């Protein structure tokens, strides 16, 4: 054994760096594409290079690292890569604020964060590292964009977009949260621009239907995607004008509730509907109303929660089922041009939005659905009745259920030629144009003669110019004096480059494929990539459910449709981890305080500088605004990587939030010292004898820890390790105790790799423990020889007995009847019946 032995305390400041260097030098975590081993692809969502990792990163990547190390020990060839989601607005903001080029700022941040991640000892294949801002990556993304363009899955059109007036760029609906830009927080406006779109709607049915096969995804995420895609069965039909405006004779409407047509009291169109535009030319007040509508974003949620406003056009429409009924036509701020037909009819009695609108503009409210016939004339107040029921006040539909009425109305509309049954989706095509510099240039050239012309692939990548400035808001590419001026590759005439860049969510929609295969001459090699794909286990935040995760599913399908891939789903398993939280603190004036500004003692919590008492607030997600962020670097300096990793896996189930506490990390540090002392037991000379209880605990631990890791129940794995350590510490010297201590370091190697490697080395074991095999358990040794059974009298628990497993029924009965508690309950009576359930209970019926 090494001369250093195990007499000293575990010192991570010496140990951590040594093993990190050895792992890197050996290349032991480099994945081999052509290995004969089973392939496992473990991936955490790659980070934006902000310049520092936070505790959320540490938790996320520790979980993935445990899986990667575990499956490597189980004999798998494991791909566990890391990269950087490196384009985006923060780099441009930094360029403006600090007078530094976005590339320089980004690459500096990447270098810093790479070293921070290496300090935690993650088993990452750094040979596959990528950054989306590198031409070697985004040039291949441009090639894929052109492939999709050729296949008709990319198009350009004028569209109402969500405009962020601070970032001066377009936002997808998913990037608008409560009416504000997801990064800037600015109130979003509606604006018309020529935009590039990806045809995600082409795959709407398949994206929706495919969710049912994702049985290793959280139900919450699948439900969120299902609602976002939003498939609706309904009817498209038209209303004729009573007196038609010039150029129009009818309005096409889509509804999911044709059964409520007899309850209609108005028709509303979007502010950018062709009829609204035509009417605005002749009505001086309408343009002002339309301009007010355009201050809203295009996201459905924001429109739904905004105050409902309408402009009465003075025109009327004829009801298709009751020609005597005339409905007023409004331009309304809650109707979207790109959903359905851009026109709806309102049934106030049974839709809250329509009711709010009707009450505001004094429109009729007519009940047409009631829970029973007796309630057919029950008045509607200020709350719409959305309950199911039967049709009332609806002519030939009366008495039918809503579902029957829908079918009846659609059948009549189709027979008479004024409507038809149809399916629509809430999902819109993905607008990917962004008016910013720091993104992937869209590889299109605009020519007055030829129109939009793809950049020839042999001219890719279209790289970003370095000589730009951010003195003015907006897109520097648009202002660049030379970059956008080119020759048309088709006709040779002067032309201009597309100055929009791609939404950064395009970058993250295929990076996991590039990790699997990185040839220089194409985006990826299909055969090589599919040795790894789909990703076996993907780990990241639930906030990406309808952003990145939906886009990645679309991108994979799009690539399959053009023959680039044979798979449709990118991620077999998805795990959404909880956040890392921390107490919040305020000074007497109510200002937020950071943990570094306070000190704690027995008397309470006080400001270090002034001694004033601090108010302790709720435990909340770590955030800069509330100053409750705990930086990983000083914690790593104090406790080492393994204690931090252990904390991240302990206590809370990984899908729940984890509260960071000093007491918790101190406890993890102490447990590292306990593990180190167990290593000394493993170094003992072998003793004779078998400890059956410890042997049973050991084999149960091997089984239970493995099952817990595979089930991503890391806190349960930690608990089982604690049980085993307790058992080893209590046991007397024996061959079993030495075996258990040796085995322990393979069991904890995925969680605390540095300590495990050091112990493995000092125990003179060959190679890395990271490359050792996961221990096997003997099923026979996981079965307890003795069990506890319940003893009941008349079905109520009266005693418990410890008996041999599989004890014969008659022996169990004798033991139960001999129980003093049972004898006391029977009071000398003979039992009427005794029921014995082997290995579980004895029930005495008195």
Curated annotation (Swiss-Prot):
Keyword Ligase: yes
A GO cellular component annotation in the UniProt record: cytosol
Record motif 'KMSKS' region, residues: 621-625
Chief localisation class: cytoplasm
Xref: InterPro entries: aa-tRNA-synth_I_CS, aa-tRNA-synth_Ia, Leu-tRNA-ligase, Leu_tRNA-synth_edit, M/V/L/I-tRNA-synth_anticd-bd, Methionyl/Leucyl_tRNA_Synth, Rossmann-like_a/b/a_fold, tRNAsynth_Ia_anticodon-bd
EC number, UniProt record: 6.1.1.4
Binding site for ATP: 624
Location of this chain's protein in the cell: Cytoplasm
Swiss-Prot/TrEMBL catalytic activity: tRNA(Leu) + L-leucine + ATP = L-leucyl-tRNA(Leu) + AMP + diphosphate
Superkingdom: Bacteria
GO biological process, one term: leucyl-tRNA aminoacylation
GO molecular function: aminoacyl-tRNA deacylase activity; ATP binding; leucine-tRNA ligase activity
Residue ranges of the motif 'HIGH' region: 47-57
Keywords noted in UniProt: Aminoacyl-tRNA synthetase, ATP-binding, Cytoplasm, Ligase, Nucleotide-binding, Protein biosynthesis
Family: Belongs to the class-I aminoacyl-tRNA synthetase family.
Protein name per Swiss-Prot or TrEMBL: Leucine--tRNA ligase
Species per Swiss-Prot/TrEMBL record: Zymomonas mobilis subsp. mobilis (strain ATCC 31821 / ZM4 / CP4)
Gene: leuS
């Amino acid at each position: 054994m090494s001369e250093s032995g195990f007499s000293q305390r575990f010192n991570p400041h010496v140990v951590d760096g040594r093993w990190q260097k050895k792992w890197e030098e050996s290349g032991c975590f480099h994945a081999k594409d052509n290995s004969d081993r089973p392939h496992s692809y473990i991936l955490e969502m790659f980070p934006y290079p902000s310049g520092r990792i936070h505790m959320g990163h540490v938790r996320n990547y520790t979980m993935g690292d445990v899986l990667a190390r575990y499956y490597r020990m189980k004999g798998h060839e494991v791909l566990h890569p890391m990269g950087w989601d490196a384009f985006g607005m923060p780099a441009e903001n930094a360029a403006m604020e600090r007078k530094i080029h976005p590339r320089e700022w980004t690459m500096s941040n990447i270098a810093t964060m790479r070293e921070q991640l290496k300090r935690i000892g993650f088993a990452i294949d750094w040979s596959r590292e990528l950054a989306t801002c590198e031409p070697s990556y985004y040039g291949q993304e441009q090639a894929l964009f052109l492939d999709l363009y050729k296949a008709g899955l990319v198009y350009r059109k004028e569209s109402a977009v969500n405009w962020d007036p601070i970032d001066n760029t377009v936002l997808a609906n998913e990037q608008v949260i409560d009416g504000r830009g997801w990064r800037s927080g600015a109130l979003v406006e509606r604006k018309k621009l020529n935009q590039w779109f990806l045809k995600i709607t082409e795959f709407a049915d398949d994206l929706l239907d495919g969710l049912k096969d994702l049985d290793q995804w959280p139900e919450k995420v699948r439900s969120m995607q299902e609602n976002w895609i939003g498939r609706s069965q309904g009817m498209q039909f038209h209303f004729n004008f009573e007196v038609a405006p010039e150029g129009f004779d009818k309005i096409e409407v889509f509804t999911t509730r044709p059964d409520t047509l007899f309850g209609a009291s108005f028709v509303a169109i979007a502010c950018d509907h062709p009829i609204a535009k035509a009417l605005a030319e002749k009505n001086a007040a309408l343009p002002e109303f339309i301009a007010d509508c355009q201050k809203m974003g295009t996201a459905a949620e924001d429109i739904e929660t905004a105050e409902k406003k309408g402009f009465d056009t003075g025109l009327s429409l004829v009801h298709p089922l009751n020609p005597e009924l005339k409905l007023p036509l409004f331009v309304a701020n809650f109707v979207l041009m790109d959903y359905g037909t851009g026109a709806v009819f309102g049934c106030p009695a049974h839709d809250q939005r329509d009711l709010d609108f009707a009450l505001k503009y004094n429109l009729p409210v007519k009940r047409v659905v009631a829970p029973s016939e007796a309630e057919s004339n029950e008045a509607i107040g200020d709350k719409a009745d959305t309950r199911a029921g039967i049709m009332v006040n609806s002519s030939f539909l009366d008495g039918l259920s809503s579902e029957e009425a829908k079918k009846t109305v659609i059948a009549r509309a189709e027979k008479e030629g004024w409507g038809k049954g149809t399916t629509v989706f809430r999902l819109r095509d993905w607008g990917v144009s962004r008016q910013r510099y720091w993104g992937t240039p869209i590889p299109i050239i605009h020519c007055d003669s030829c129109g939009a012309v793809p950049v020839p692939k042999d001219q890719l990548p279209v790289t970003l110019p370095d000589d730009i400035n951010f003195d003015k808001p907006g897109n520097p590419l648009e202002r660049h004096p030379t970059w956008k001026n080119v020759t048309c590759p088709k006709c040779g005439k002067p032309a201009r480059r597309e100055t929009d860049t791609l939404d950064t969510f395009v970058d993250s929609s295929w990076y996991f494929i590039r990790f699997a295969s990185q040839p220089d001459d194409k985006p990826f090699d299909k055969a090589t990539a599919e040795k790894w794909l789909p990703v076996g286990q993907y780990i990241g935040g639930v906030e990406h459910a309808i952003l990145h995760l939906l886009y990645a599913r679309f991108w994979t399908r799009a690539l399959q449709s053009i023959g680039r891939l044979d798979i449709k789903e990118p991620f077999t398993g998805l795990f959404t981890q909880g956040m890392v939280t921390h107490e919040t603190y305020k000074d007497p004036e109510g200002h937020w305080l950071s943990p570094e500004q306070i000190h704690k003692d027995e008397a309470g919590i006080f400001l270090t500088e002034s001694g004033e008492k601090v108010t302790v607030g709720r435990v909340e997600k770590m955030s800069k605004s509330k100053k409750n962020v705990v930086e990983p670097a000083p914690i790593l300096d104090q406790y080492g990587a393994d204690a931090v990793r252990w904390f991240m896996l302990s206590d809370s189930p990984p899908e729940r939030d984890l509260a960071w506490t000093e007491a918790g990390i101190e406890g993890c540090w102490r447990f590292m010292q306990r593990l180190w002392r167990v290593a000394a037991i493993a170094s003992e000379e072998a003793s004779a004898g078998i400890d059956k209880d410890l042997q049973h605990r050991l084999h149960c631990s091997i089984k239970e820890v493995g099952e817990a890791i595979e089930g991503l129940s890391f806190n349960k794995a930690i608990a089982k390790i604690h049980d085993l350590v307790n058992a080893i510490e209590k046991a007397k010297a024996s061959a079993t105790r030495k075996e258990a201590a040796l085995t322990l370091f393979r069991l904890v190697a995925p969680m605390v790799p540095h300590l495990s490697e050091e112990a493995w080395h000092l125990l003179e074991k060959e190679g890395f423990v990271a490359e050792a095999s996961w221990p096997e358990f003997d099923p026979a040794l996981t079965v307890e020889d003795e069990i506890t059974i319940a003893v009941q009298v008349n079905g109520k628990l009266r005693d418990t007995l410890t008996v041999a497993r599989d004890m014969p029924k008659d022996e169990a009965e004798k033991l139960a009847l001999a129980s003093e508690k049972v004898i006391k309950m029977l009071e000398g009576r003979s039992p009427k019946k005794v029921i014995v359930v082997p290995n579980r209970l004895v029930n005495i019926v008195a």
